[in-house]
């Protein structure tokens, strides 16, 4: 009997040792599609604030396959949050508008300083936040000027708002110059960036939204990664019409936007936000084009595909007015 008791004690001690080792080893978590900081924090019985502190996160944006510390001491911020003089080292979750707000500048200025042609940045990247603009010799090869008209050849990763910022104009002006009715551009495409507008505006009237009230926010994207709200926030930032990051679930967006001073109606325009109260959380999408037959084309996430995947859908003319639009 005595021997059995001793064996039981030893076995229990060994089990405890094994359990401790496994708990100590489980200090990181690999993000899966659909995860959010809240769900991960809840899984490990910690607060979102603690999880963000452990990983030096400045926003709620996370990415699939990203490794997050879920236990241990807070990461030293000296290596990842470096800001020496006029340069800044990008951290996970950063956006150009967020960095610009931190340094009292604009995202267009940062793009110009670093020769950026799109909004894509990555952790560890060093960005100039003050000083002289980067040499644009590498970009001039795609630009031609003939008389009073200047053209630009689109490169991979370009957006209309980025091109507009580069030439000190607006994306609406470029759309008008080239007779564009949506934001879709492709590498190799030649765009007029100055001169006279193209004739035959067969559908460009959809961009005529001068009467709309459209405040602009320079917030970081705090919406859950891959959701419809996350996608629309990014799309609006890309066209220079940033929205608030505090509108919460999609079914609250029309009320929150109206409170912030945006025009809300049932008329779709290119670049407006389609909003619906369908489902438990509601849904939002980005209006890519208003078509000649009265239908509209929208882009969205987490509607007919998994979170993080952009899909496109055409809303028939007969259904367009059944949705609310934020301008």
Curated annotation (Swiss-Prot):
Catalytic activity as recorded in UniProt: Hydrolyzes the link between N-acetylmuramoyl residues and L-amino acid residues in certain cell-wall glycopeptides
Q: Which residues form the signal peptide?
A: 1-25
**Do you know which SMART domains this protein is assigned to?**
LysM
- Which residue intervals define the domain LysM in the entry? 27-70, 86-129, 150-193
Subcellular location(s): the record lists: Secreted; Cell surface
Please cite one Gene Ontology biological process associated with this protein: killing of cells of another organism
Provide ranges: composition bias, Low complexity. Answer: 71-87
Task: List the residue ranges of the region (Disordered).
Answer: 68-89
GO MF terms here are: lytic endotransglycosylase activity; N-acetylmuramoyl-L-alanine amidase activity
- At the top level, the lineage of the source is Bacteria
- Return the EC number: 3.5.1.28
Q: Provide the alphabetized UniProt keywords.
A: Antimicrobial, Bacteriolytic enzyme, Cell cycle, Cell division, Cell wall biogenesis/degradation, Hydrolase, Repeat, Secreted, Septation, Signal, Virulence
Q: Which GO terms describe its cellular component?
A: cell surface; extracellular region
In this protein, which residues make up the domain named Peptidase C51?
203-327
Tell me which InterPro entries the record gives.
Answer: CHAP_dom, LysM_dom, LysM_dom_sf, Papain-like_cys_pep_sf
Role of this protein: Peptidoglycan hydrolase involved in the splitting of the septum during cell division.
What is the official name of this protein in its record? N-acetylmuramoyl-L-alanine amidase sle1
Native organism is Staphylococcus saprophyticus subsp. saprophyticus (strain ATCC 15305 / DSM 20229 / NCIMB 8711 / NCTC 7292 / S-41)
């Amino acid at each position: 009997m005595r021997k059995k008791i001793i064996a039981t004690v030893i076995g229990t001690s060994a089990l405890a040792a094994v359990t401790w080792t496994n708990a100590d080893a489980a200090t990181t978590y690999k993000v899966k599609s659909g995860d959010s900081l809240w769900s991960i924090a809840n899984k490990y019985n910690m607060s979102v604030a603690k999880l963000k502190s452990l990983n030096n996160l400045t926003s709620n944006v996370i990415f699939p396959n990203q490794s997050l510390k879920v236990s241990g001491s807070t990461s030293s911020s000296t290596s990842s949050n470096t800001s020496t003089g006029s340069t800044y080292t990008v951290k996970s979750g950063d956006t150009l508008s967020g960095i610009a707000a931190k340094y009292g500048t604009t995202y267009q200025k940062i793009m110009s300083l670093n020769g950026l042609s799109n909004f894509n940045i990555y952790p560890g990247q060093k960005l100039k936040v003050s000083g002289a603009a980067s040499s644009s010799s590498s970009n001039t090869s795609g630009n031609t000027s003939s008389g009073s008209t200047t053209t630009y050849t689109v490169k991979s990763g370009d957006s209309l708002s980025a091109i507009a910022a580069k030439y000190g104009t607006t994306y609406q002006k470029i759309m008008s110059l080239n007779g564009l009715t949506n934001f879709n551009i492709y590498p190799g495409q030649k765009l007029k960036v100055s001169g006279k507008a193209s004739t035959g505006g067969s559908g460009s009237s959809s961009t005529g939204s001068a009467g709309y009230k459209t405040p602009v926010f320079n917030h970081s994207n705090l919406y859950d990664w891959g959701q419809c709200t996350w996608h629309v926030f990014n799309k609006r930032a890309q066209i220079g019409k940033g929205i608030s990051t505090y509108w919460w679930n999609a079914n609250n967006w029309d009320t929150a936007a109206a409170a912030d001073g945006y025009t809300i109606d049932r008329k779709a325009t290119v670049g407006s936000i389609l909003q619906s109260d369908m489902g438990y959380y509601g849904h939002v999408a980005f209006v890519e084009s208003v078509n000649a037959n009265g239908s509209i084309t929208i882009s969205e996430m987490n509607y007919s595909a998994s979170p993080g995947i952009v899909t496109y859908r055409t809303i028939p003319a007969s259904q367009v007015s059944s949705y609310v639009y934020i301008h």
